Amino acid sequence: HVCLEVDDVYQAIIELKDSGVEVLNDIPKIGAEGFKVIFIHPKFTGGVLVELAERPA
């Protein structure tokens, strides 16, 4: 599993979906240290689970 930090997880969801990429959760969950997180479906990332995380304000 790989985690990448993004500035705006909601914008990332929109951009991914507009590009035809499936995310596992449309609504971010609160992860470690309060980060908002989503996951990209592994079928779009060569079998790797990719997490996108937005730092808490």
Q: PLM ranges: what are they?
A:
Residues H1-A57:
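Vicinal oxygen chelate
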